[in-house]
Amino acid sequence: MSRFEEQRQWGNLTRNLKRGVLALKENAVVQDGRVYDQNGVDKSHLAELSVKTTPAQREALQAVDELSTHELENGHFVFAFFESCKTMAERYPAFTQPDLARLMFIGTYTGYQTGRLQHDNGKVIDKRALETLIGISRNRFAEFYRKLIDADIVQEQGGEIHINPSVFFRGPLKESGYKLSEYSHTRMFRKTVRDLYAIYKGRKTAQLAIIYAVLPFLNFRTNVVCFNPQDSDDDLRAMNLDHLAALLGYKDTDKLRRALEGIVIDGEPVFWLPHNAKDRRQKRIVVNPRVVFAGPAESLGAVKVLFS
């Protein structure tokens, strides 16, 4: 109700009713969501309960709502774990870039708290179903699956496939059953990753591995790729494209740039490459929060606007 409407309705009240409302305001008792006057008479029809918040509290609540909406729009999330500033190539030396992209994809099918690979409707994804889901040849799948087993990423239990909670987990982290303090983690949004995997098939699959590869260097609040992602904002050292290329094993920086700029979801770039303000020959790297975002709710809007 607008302020003008409130004033109009107040002016239409009789003198006795106005006196009663003012008395109710001074002496009201709230019980079980109902409003009673000093005589115990229910006056809920004359009163409206509201929570009084400060501007800062209202902004925080709005930010939380925005994060919840963001999670819903992008298919909710799975926690992806990694060791900060340690490349995925170091953690999984046997994996090719397409392997890393496939690993990221199957992580989105991690069951809530169980770690079991399953569809959103609860249907179990066994080994044969996983081969179909990934969409590669039988021989290539057999090789990939063997790598998953050897790296202790998945285990078979009674025909079901369970994923290691130190790689992907859905649910409260205290329910994982693992000590995960040595790892960092981020929210990886399931629908976005699945949509990207459906778009970038065949030879293009390797491009998606870059998303997974940059996670250990991603600052949580800003989604900027950094040398020191865990430090405070004032101390962050953003990584240039040249450095990222060297880190990921690209001999040609321009090839990496084209790969990054070529990944798009619903018309939005997955990577934004702004120029370094102090040296326009250098480019920074920012990741679209529709794919991954680990920051607090109040930081989301500032990152999203870069991609809108």
Role assignments for model-derived ranges:
Residues 126, 159-181, 276-299:
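Short, cationic-aromatic polyanion-contact patches
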Residues 1-120, 158, 168-236:
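Short recognition helix of helix-turn-helix/winged-helix DNA-binding domains
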Residues 1-22, 26, 112-163, 223-282:
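Winged helix-turn-helix DNA-binding recognition segment
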